[in-house]
């Protein structure tokens, strides 16, 4: 603690008294290069520290939503589709698309892999924003 007190009470005032600070703005032009560096460098460092501290203080904090109490396992996406399979894969032939197909991405659809709008209920319950995957065929 004595070292900090000595730094603030003795060494810092001595350092500031020795700085060649001009009395006017035109006096900066008359400073030698070494004197200019001795004045500008500490000013730049202190200005940067004040600016960075202000930025960090006012920087918006990330908001994490609490997990929904209705979700049993928040790490599991697929809660009911083909749970006996190691990996659920559905293939759709591109010629079968026709005008448009809407695929489920929330894993809640009763017509999986096609969307039946179940994501709307899921989004309300879980505060999520999941939507369907829409695949359109080429327009002739």
Swiss-Prot record:
CC annotations in GO: endoplasmic reticulum membrane; mitochondrial outer membrane
The record's free-text note on cofactor binding: Binds 1 [2Fe-2S] cluster.
Side Cytoplasmic, residues: 60-140
GO BP term, example: intracellular iron ion homeostasis
Domain of life: Eukaryota
GO molecular function: 2 iron, 2 sulfur cluster binding; L-cysteine transaminase activity; metal ion binding
Transmembrane segments: 36-59
UniProt xrefs under Gene3D superfamilies: CDGSH iron-sulfur domain, mitoNEET-type (3.40.5.90)
Spans within the Lumenal topological domain: 1-35
Keyword Transmembrane helix: yes
Pfam family, one: zf-CDGSH
Name this polypeptide is given: CDGSH iron-sulfur domain-containing protein 2 homolog
Organism lineage string: Eukaryota, Metazoa, Placozoa, Uniplacotomia, Trichoplacea
